[in-house]
């Protein structure tokens, strides 16, 4: 599974873990709702970059 980093605040979305905002573990970044935002700073999904 992949990880994505918020380019604004550095929050890391880990697909294997989901997030504390009712996103289940195993949820792919591409499958997050269009209105999902960074739980730390509120940035849109387009502020995230895939980590190597």
From Swiss-Prot:
PROSITE patterns: RUBREDOXIN (PS00202), RUBREDOXIN_LIKE (PS50903). GO terms for biological process: alkane catabolic process. Binds 1 Fe(3+) ion per subunit. GO terms for molecular function: electron transfer activity; iron ion binding. Residues 1-51 form the Rubredoxin-like domain. Fe cation binds at residues 6, 9, 38, 41. It holds the Pfam family Rubredoxin. Keywords: Electron transport, Iron, Metal-binding, Transport. Transmembrane segments: none annotated. The keyword Cell cycle does not apply. The keyword Electron transport applies. Signal peptide: none annotated. CDD domains: rubredoxin. Its cofactor is Fe(3+). Rubredoxin is a small nonheme, iron protein lacking acid-labile sulfide. Its single Fe, chelated to 4 Cys, functions as an electron acceptor and may also stabilize the conformation of the molecule. Belongs to the rubredoxin family. This is Rubredoxin. It comes from Megasphaera elsdenii.
């Amino acid at each position: 599974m992949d990880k994505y980093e918020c380019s604004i605040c550095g929050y890391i979305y880990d697909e294997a873990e989901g997030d504390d905002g009712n996103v289940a573990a195993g949820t792919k970044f591409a499958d997050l709702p269009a209105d999902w935002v960074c739980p730390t700073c509120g940035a849109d999904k387009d502020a995230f970059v895939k980590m190597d």
